[in-house]
Every structure is written in C-alpha cells, then in structure tokens.
Amino acid sequence: MTMDADAMETETTDQVSASPLHFARSYQVEALEKAIKQNTIVFLETGSGKTLIAIMLLRSYAYLFRKPSPCFCVFLVPQVVLVTQQAEALKMHTDLKVGMYWGDMGVDFWDSSTWKQEVDKYEVLVMTPAILLDALRHSFLSLSMIKVLIVDECHHAGGKHPYACIMREFYHKELNSGTSNVPRIFGMTASLVKTKGENLDSYWKKIHELETLMNSKVYTCENESVLAGFVPFSTPSFKYYQHIKIPSPKRASLVEKLERLTIKHRLSLGTLDLNSSTVDSVEKRLLRISSTLTYCLDDLGILLAQKAAQSLSASQNDSFLWGELNMFSVALVKKFCSDASQEFLAEIPQGLNWSVANINGNAEAGLLTLKTVCLIETLLGYSSLENIRCIIFVDRVITAIVLESLLAEILPNCNNWKTKYVAGNNSGLQNQTRKKQNEIVEDFRRGLVNIIVATSILEEGLDVQSCNLVIRFDPASNICSFIQSRGRARMQNSDYLMMVESGDLLTQSRLMKYLSGGKRMREESLDHSLVPCPPLPDDSDEPLFRVESTGATVTLSSSVSLIYHYCSRLPSDEYFKPAPRFDVNKDQGSCTLYLPKSCPVKEVKAEANNKVLKQAVCLKACIQLHKVGALSDHLVPDMVVAETVSQKLEKIQYNTEQPCYFPPELVSQFSAQPETTYHFYLIRMKPNSPRNFHLNDVLLGTRVVLEDDIGNTSFRLEDHRGTIAVTLSYVGAFHLTQEEVLFCRRFQITLFRVLLDHSVENLMEALNGLHLRDGVALDYLLVPSTHSHETSLIDWEVIRSVNLTSHEVLEKHENCSTNGASRILHTKDGLFCTCVVQNALVYTPHNGYVYCTKGVLNNLNGNSLLTKRNSGDQTYIEYYEERHGIQLNFVDEPLLNGRHIFTLHSYLHMAKKKKEKEHDREFVELPPELCHVILSPISVDMIYSYTFIPSVMQRIESLLIAYNLKKSIPKVNIPTIKVLEAITTKKCEDQFHLESLETLGDSFLKYAVCQQLFQHCHTHHEGLLSTKKDGMISNVMLCQFGCQQKLQGFIRDECFEPKGWMVPGQSSAAYSLVNDTLPESRNIYVASRRNLKRKSVADVVESLIGAYLSEGGELAALMFMNWVGIKVDFTTTKIQRDSPIQAEKLVNVGYMESLLNYSFEDKSLLVEALTHGSYMMPEIPRCYQRLEFLGDSVLDYLITKHLYDKYPCLSPGLLTDMRSASVNNECYALVAVKANLHKHILYASHHLHKHISRTVSEFEQSSLQSTFGWESDISFPKVLGDVIESLAGAIFVDSGYNKEVVFASIKPLLGCMITPETVKLHPVRELTELCQKWQFELSKAKDFDSFTVEVKAKEMSFAHTAKASDKKMAKKLAYKEVLNLLKNSLDY
C-alpha cells in the first residue's frame, strides 16, 4: 500500500466496525474484517458467498452514505443481467435504498441534474462500469462522493476495460494527488487470472498487476478444505468424442452450393438501388452467414446447418440481424438464407421411415456429427436423474439456437425435459431481450426449464443452487471462463463435463492446467500477501483536456470515441451519415481531421507521434468544439444537452382540471341603495323564414355599459326551420327600485325555470330563495319589451303577472263579465276571468305538464266529445275519469286551448337541428279547473321568444369573456368577435372555431422563432436549431405560456347545453362564483371547473397569434407573443459569413439566378443552398441544412398567409387542409424536378444519385402535372424538396430578410396555387376519417418492403398490399388504393 492509502484507511477504519450477519461463515467474517482494514480483492470459488461479504461491508459503512448524506456507494457488475440479481440481494439483506442502471435506460443522455436526483434518492447504485466511467468523465458524478466501490468479477480490470479506466483515470489520479478522499475498494472474483494457456509460473505477475491496478490485496482461504464444508464442488471429467467429417462428396457438394448461392446473390445486388457502403455491408453479411453455415455443417452436421439457415431466414428482428440494411437488402439476405435452407433440406430424408431420434443412423449419414451425438448420449445417460438442471456452454450464438431446437425434438421422446437457449444480443446473428433471458433463468430456477444451452453470458453471476450438471460443449477459452462455468454447478455431487475431441492433446493439456490453476492462484496470493501494492505508474503525461468549471475530462485515449459520438448526433439522412474523416500523413507526422459541414468546426490539424495521430487531432478537436459551445462544460454534445432539456420540458406537470371564467360585467354585489341603475339593450330576433309564432323583442339590462362591439352587435342563431338574425342595440339607462328589481328577477326565474325543467318542482325553491341580500350574484335582467317608447320599454304588466291571487284578478277584471266579453272560470288557484287564463302559463298537477294557453274554446266543455283521434264517442268527463281518475266538477265551463311548453335547445351549433319531438297534437284542450296559473298574462309568442334567450346570452357571455381577455393584452385592439373565434374550440360545435386562426398563427409562430434562432445561433446546426425551436413552441411550452397568463379560463371548450345555463337572479346558492385575479390584477369569476387538454391551451395560444396577425399585422402578433411570454423580435443582424468562395466554379450561377428571377449579392449563399451534407469538399464551408430550416418556415408562413388572405370566408378546417396539401416535401420535390434543379445539387452519394435518376425517369414517363396535393405515386428523395426550402432561405437572408422578395421568386416555381375546389386530403387521413365517420373497421400491417391496409365495411372487405422503395410511400399507396375501392363500391 502507498502511504496515502494507508493514511486514508487508518482514518476510516477507526470509525467502521464490522457488521456481520448472524449466518455468515467464518471465512466470510474474516474477509469482512480484512476489507474494513484495507482495499481487498476477495478471491473465492463461485458459490462461496462473495456477494454476502460485499453486503456486510456496505452495512458496516452505511452510516457514511445514508440519506440525507450526499455520499453513496457504487456496486459495479460486468453484465446487465447481473444488475437486477445483485440489487435484489442488497434489498434482501439491507435496508439501503438501491438504484439500478444499465444502458437501455437511456442514461447516456442524462445530465448532472438527473444524476443528482438519483444520488439524492438512492444510497447504493448498481450499474455496469461503462455508465460510471462516462459519468465520471463528464463530471456528473464525483469519485470523492463514493464511499465504497464494489467491483464484481474484477478480473476484467485490464487493458481498456471500463474497470481499468475508472481506476487509472480517476482513482489513482486522486490517490497520487495526496487526497485521502477516495472510496474503499472491494473486488470479487473466482479467478484472479484471465489467460488462455500461459505457464503457471506467470500467474503471480498477473495477480500483482491486478492488485496494483485495484490498489488492493487479495484475500483467499488458505486451504480449499475450508470452503469444502460450505461450498459443493463439482466433479470434473472429460467426455471424448471422435471427430469424423461428414462424407466427403456430400460435404463438397453442399459447400459448392453455398458458394454458388453466395455468388448469385452478390451479383443480384447490382439490380438493387443501393449505395456502395450498403453493397459492401450486404456482401459482408452474405459471406459471414455462409461461413457460419459452413461451420455448422462441419461441427454439428447437415441437420443443424439446415436449422441454422432456417432460423436466420425466419428472423423478424431487423435491428440486430440485419443492422442498417434497407428493406430490399434485408429481403435479399433472407432469400439467401432460405435458399441455403432448401439446399440442406434436400439432403435430409423425409417421410415416416426417417426419424430425428435415430441419432446413430443420422450420424452415419452425416446429418449429425459425432460431437453432437456425444452430447445427446451424455444427456440421455442422466435420464434417471429426476430434477435435472443442466447448462450446456457453447461458443457461438447459432450453436445455442440450433442445439436447443434439436434437443427440443429428441429429448421429449425420452423424458419430459424442457430445453431453452440463452445468448448475448450483440453478436449480430440473433437478438434475445433481457426480459426473455431473465424469464428463462427464472424458469430454470423453478424447474420449469431443465436444460439451458448458453453462451458465455451465463458464466458470470447466475445463481442457481439446484444446477447439478454443466457440460462444456465447446472448451473454455481461458481459465477464467473455465472456473466460472464450472462454478455454475452448485448442487452437491454435481458433474462438470468437458467435451474434448479424441487425440486433441493440446486442448486436453490446456484444460488440465485450468484444473490446477485455481490452486496455483491461491498459493501465489498467500505467498505474497505481505507484499505491499506499489503505486501505479503515473501516466499523467498523457495529454488530456479538463474543463475547469465542472472537472469533466477527455483524454487522448477517449477523445476519438467522443468525436465519433459528437458526429453521430449531427443531422443526417438516408444518404449521408455524418462521421469524421482523417487525412493522415505519417511521413510528416501530421493528421488533418475533417468534420461534417453541419459542425461549427470544419477542419483541425495536429502533429504527434504516428501511433497517436488520430487521438491527438481528436483531442484538439474536442478542445475547439468545447470552445465554440458544441461540447458543453460536461463535454456532452450540444444536441444531447438540447434533447435533455427538451425531454425535461415534456415532463412538465399539467393539471387537466381548469377553471371556466364568467364575465364580471354580468356579476355584481348587493347594493343597499333604494334605486339601481340598469343599462338596457334591445334584443331583436328576426327569422329568415315564416314561423308559427312571432318572435318578440326582449330587453337585456346590465349594471354596466357594455363595450360597443358587444352592446351593438349582431349574430345569427340556427334551428331546423332556418336562421334567426339577432341584433343588440343600446336603448338607455333606467333607474329601478328594489321592488321593481325583485319583480323582474321573479319573472325571469319563473319563466326560465319552467322552460328549463318543464315542471314546477324546482320553481318554488328558486323563488323562496329570491331576495336582494346576496353577496356576489348574477345581476342582469331579461325582461319583455312593450314595443312602445311612449311610456316604458319594459312590459311591467307581464312582469307583475307572477303568482297573482284570484282576489286580485277578480278586482281588476270585475267589469269584464258585465260587458259579455268574458266570464269567470274555476281554476286550481280559484276564480279567474277568461281574459286572464286565455294567455297564460299553466301547470296541470294530474300529469305534471306545463302548458301555454292561447284562447278559450267556447264551443267545447266537459260534455263535449274528445277531438282526439281514435277517441270514438268518449266525452272529456269520461276521458279524465277513465284516464286520470278525476271527476270534473265544472263541466259546463269552456275548455282552454293549451300548447305543450317549448323545449330549449342550443341554437348556436353549426349542425342542422333535428325537428324537436312534438306531442300527438300541437294544441290540447284543458279543463280550467285542473290548471294552476303560473304567469298571466303572457302570450305564446313571448314564451317562444324566451326559448332563444339562453343561446343569445351564451353568445353575449362568450363575447364578454373574449373582451375581458382582450383587455388583458395591452397596446393592441382587435375586434372582440375575432378573439372569441380564437378561444372557441371545435368541441363547442359553434358556427366558427379556432382552426383557421390556429393554422395561421402556427405558421407565423414557427416563422418568427426560426428567424430569430437562425440569426442569434449562427453556429448551431439544423438539428440543434430544430430541437431549440421545438423547445420554444411545443404544445407543452405553449400551454405553459398560456397558463402563466391564465388563458385556460377563457377557453370555450364545451358544447353549450341550455340545461346547464345559470339563470340570472336566482339565489347564489344555486351556483358558485369564485373570485379570481388575472395577472394584471383585474378580477374575474370562475363559474365552474372542467377538463381541458394541454393541447387545447396550446392551440388557443397559436390561434390568438393568428387573430392578432390577421387583424393587426405582424407587429400586433409579436406584441401578443411578447405578452404571453414568447420573446421574439424581427431586428435583423448581419451575420459574418465565411470567406467568399468562387461560386461560379461550383454551380451555374447564371442559370439559377435566371430561374429564381433573383440576383444574389452573396453568391456563397446560393452554393450553400445547393450543397448536400454528403458533399465534403473543404472549399464549401456549409451544407444547406440551416438554410432549409429557415426556408421551410418562411415558405410555410408565406403560403399559409397567402391562402388565408385570398380566401377570407373559408370554413374552419379547410385552410388547414389547403396548407397541408400545399406545404409538404412532395410538392416541393415535384417542383424541383420540373425546374431541373436536381442537375444543380452538389452531393457525393451514389444512393442519392440513383434515387434522383429513378425519380426523374418515372416523372418523365408519368402524366403528372399538378404541383400540389397527394396525387404523385413517385417516391421523391427528400433532398429535392429540401433544396426548394433552402433556396427560399438563401434568398430571404440575401435580401435582408424580405419575405416579399422570397414569395415573388419562389411562387412562379410553385405554379398554380391550390384552391378550395382543388384541395385533396392525404389518402391516409381521408380513409381514416371516412372509417371513423361510418364506423368501419380499419386495420393495417407492415413488413420489410410492403404495407397492407384492410377495411371491413357493411359485411364487405377491402384490402390492398403496396410495395415501394420506402415504407412511407408504400403506406400512402395502400391507403390510396383501398380508399378508391371503397368509394367505387359504396358510392361515398
């Protein structure tokens, strides 16, 4: 040990005391005590309980890292499969908080704040070593915060393994600096040496190197007998087999057929549209698979070679087996495997006379090798073992796959053993998920699986106590593999069988050394136990770069991987994958690094020793990339940082329960003044067609004067009869006494409650609660008008008709009966004059109905025959007695002509109203004595008019809400109705909604933000610009902005339902109004709460931008955006361009300027706009991606604004469809081909060249002329459309950010713009919406090279499978064909 380490250990161990578990074995306690005193490597047999020692060590040190301590412990394991196993062991034996980490969790993209959350939450972090190494290099974690570092299977520590890098780069550097703040190291292994066949005398050297690197001393038991009492040792033995090749002619024939197949499929590559790199990749795969099949043929036999080919041809996982190949390449490789399978199958007998179980016969025929037969016979020799648990170790994944298949066929005929395979997923031949592997291992533990055929993945860490047989089908590659695979046999009296070819003395000798290797390692460790660990040679002379602010480092050895990682995060497409390019000059000892054009650093040169030239130039590039901000202070690519920020934004919490505001203009506090001033507005309703009833005028009285564009507005209502024009006009202020206000409220409550409820059940409760001493209440009046300005506009006679007594009526109408015009009638309320009840609102308790009366039927009384159809000769007396059990008492009194009360609807909806359900007859005859009089006099026309008032008030309330929002936004004034349109969603089913304004606002927002980012972030590549743009204008952020200004309460997002309408004047107990304060300290009221989606708030922000843009121009839109929190300005700045280039030598400047009708001031912009990322010539500093980013948003906005202005009366949603059909890459690509722009693009991609050539050829043969819509069946390269956008961006920048210049230049290229008559929906959307509308069943399926769509409609099925060069086009073609079939067959 070094002195510094000793000092650290003395200081720590004074406080740490051993915390052994009561069931710990003696050697485990001894190892624990040793580990507390000094850094220790525990070298013990597999199954001896090393993990338990580590757990006890953590228990002893736990006081140092229990939360809230900022410190923690790290438990490193070499394989992902061990993370869960070791974490579960920790949870079982400690109360520590344990976190688990592996690569698939996305930890590569975590930042320091995410790691801080983890270490604040957990006390022990179990992970693979590469994760810790990256976190330390990027300074997300600090070694000084780790109190204990446990290294499982520490024999891996060597070379460039992450274990070794952690120790060299961090632990020893800290130790050599004199600090004592380093973690306690605890290593575990069953083999200190990881060698293949070195002399046993070299073991101490290897052990000493490991001790030095780990700064730890080995602990082991002095004698194997100490362990023998606790750990069962398997009995090793050799199993010999004869290696006899399959019959020579048969083998030669099969090998020749494989070679011919390989040549055939390699030649067929020329018929595919593939670039050179893809061709190389496919050829390598073909050769690799051919080699694999030849290996299976020789080592396993024809039968298993056929199974291997069949397995490879049937694989459905393209990400591992086929890598980055496109669908045609995959199909070709799979066809090769399928053809090879058929060739092997031709050599395998078929029919009842042949059986796979006849292993000896199959061996003679060459179907199985003797090695395979030996394995089967060995397993069958254990048939008497009831609960066998066997692991068969093989070298290759394909061997594991085919042996499992063979054993699954043969063994069930002899016993009930079940076989599975477990193999790693990085071989490129087969993929098996971690979950699937864990399930198989768990089934093995439980006895549901008896045999596992495994690669080395199960050598380390698998803990199955009942495993009683291990077979090495392929010999162990080194002593470590030997010891660990032997240790899998955990059961007493278990066997460890090593299959060896007879006569292979070299392999047998090597395995014999492995058998004695464990003993030799133990002896060497004990003999040198007192030899201190020397300091690790200081390699601090290795160049490195360290960021002072964070401590993040990149070394010479890690710089290359960081550069490749950075380049992998740059924008790419199917024709170009950004990667560094090295120009090495060994004679001069120099290297030039060329980085992709989207990188802010284009070229780096360095001189160094030839051995480290690439590392030296990469280290220098890392320093420069950090300087310009392309690498963060944690040395993470800027794209990763931006994506991490974006991911965090997406996780912002949002509560879907949001308020629904009510306008304060219709709410007031109780006033004790004797008179109250109301401002009255005349509501006049004029139908566009004749109706059965006249619409009377109604007065709206408010406590405040309404804004002019509300108080003098007009709009329309709709019902099944037509439309009704509604106008509001101010008629003046009136002073009402408290008594008059109460009369008005009583009237409107009575009438509206009856209309809403169609009964009087809730009426008395509502009237009993009526008084003028409420706090906050709905305070506006809706009263009938007299149509006369001479006396009073308010019809007080009707208003005062509520709850009149019989005595009052008789006094007022005592002269009616004397002049013969009227008579007295008996009612439920007493005696009334006919002139009172002939125009009244009445209630009949016997059936619970409410009627409005229209006249007296003097020719009918109780003795009259019913006028009802099919009533026969029944009288009214008989009818009421029979039907209702009522005896009429005043049978001579005339009957009333009554009509069922009107049903309230919403008359704001766009949808055509269904004719309301009417009773058997519009009017019925009512005996007066059965009627309660509710209101009188009141005409049917007046009652009919009031059925429209809730809808009228809903519109006025909405306008007032929009006005309140408008008042919150300073400096800019736009029509209130436009604000209302912007806050009304489609769910309201109103005559208008926000979609058109949202489309317009979305395009302007995108344009404004993209322009600002382009100017202010001139070193950012397109991917970074796009990520930042999305972070600024994503739905999450727009919702956040909106909620900060409390926009969510203003949004109209629910269809108006009259039954939910709040009746003005009713007691505040009937509803709840809660005061809320807007950001500018103005009051508003919350009437209710409702569920509101995040996207709805975001849509309203965009639609309000569109509203302010359409009414006030770009400045108004920017002011609104600034108010809501989106800080954007249009101040243009001159961007410093790179040194000028000779544009004429690179592109045809004259032709391009003539085509565009624009002369470039900076012609390098034109070159940049035409340069694809694959064109890596150093004289061109940039590719078109940044200009494309800008031009995309400029064109989108220009076209959307053009369509919005040209067609101002578009129905909501049509603008969105027109924009989608006009602004898309397919349209732009078609424009590029028609203008021959493809001839002027600079690129260096064979794949792109072939794609463009094919596209142009298909276009020339087609009759396609339009430049919009989705008609094209041609799969255009995206590059063609991108160039149109990049040219627009180049003109925009060169012209000083002048949009009109861009539109004047690009519009002629676009040709005829789309119109409402020519717009066509995308077939995917059109078919989807059609199926949703008619409730058809839509299903889809995709394969490597095809897309299938099926629709089941009206017991018919319509399906089509389309193939294309890309999945997107195949999908479109399939949808398009099924859509046409559906339309033609069902006439849609």
Curated annotation (Swiss-Prot):
EC annotation from Swiss-Prot or TrEMBL: 3.1.26.-
Motif mapping: DECH box: 152-155
Ranges of residues in domain Helicase C-terminal: 380-544
Biological function: Ribonuclease (RNase) III involved in RNA-mediated post-transcriptional gene silencing (PTGS). Involved in the processing of natural small interfering RNAs (nat-siRNAs, derived from cis-natural antisense transcripts) by cleaving small dsRNAs into 24 nucleotide nat-siRNAs. Plays an essential role in transitive silencing of transgenes by processing secondary siRNAs. This pathway, which requires DCL4 and RDR6, amplifies silencing by using the target RNA as substrate to generate secondary siRNAs, providing an efficient mechanism for long-distance silencing.
Disulfide bond residue pairs: none
GO biological process: cellular response to nitrogen starvation; defense response to virus; RNAi-mediated antiviral immunity against RNA virus; siRNA processing; siRNA-mediated gene silencing by inhibition of translation; ta-siRNA processing
Pfam families on file: DEAD, Dicer_dimer, Helicase_C, PAZ, Ribonuclease_3
Chain residues that bind Mg(2+): 1188, 1282, 1285
Location within or outside the cell: Nucleus; Cytoplasm
SMART domains: DEXDc, DSRM, HELICc, PAZ, RIBOc
Domain (DRBM): residue spans on this chain: 1315-1384
PAZ domain location: 805-935
MF GO annotations: ATP binding; helicase activity; metal ion binding; ribonuclease III activity; RNA binding
CC cofactor: Mg(2+); Mn(2+)
Site (Important for activity): 1278
Keywords from the named record: ATP-binding, Cytoplasm, Endonuclease, Helicase, Hydrolase, Magnesium, Manganese, Metal-binding, Nuclease, Nucleotide-binding, Nucleus, Plant defense, Repeat, RNA-binding, RNA-mediated gene silencing
Residue ranges of domain Helicase ATP-binding in the record: 31-210
Name of the protein: Endoribonuclease Dicer homolog 2
N-terminal signal peptide: none
